[in-house]
Amino acid sequence: GECCTDCAQTAAANYC
């Protein structure tokens, strides 16, 4: 999957 720019700040970092 793609990694977002603010992944480090969001829970989404788990799937990025």
Curated annotation (Swiss-Prot):
Contains 2 disulfide bonds. The keyword Endoplasmic reticulum does not apply. GO terms for cellular component: extracellular region. It is found in: Secreted. Keywords: Disulfide bond, Secreted, Toxin. The keyword Disulfide bond applies. One of its GO terms (molecular function) is toxin activity. Signal peptide: none annotated. Expressed by the venom duct. The cysteine framework is I (CC-C-C). Alpha2/8 pattern. This is Augerpeptide hhe1a.
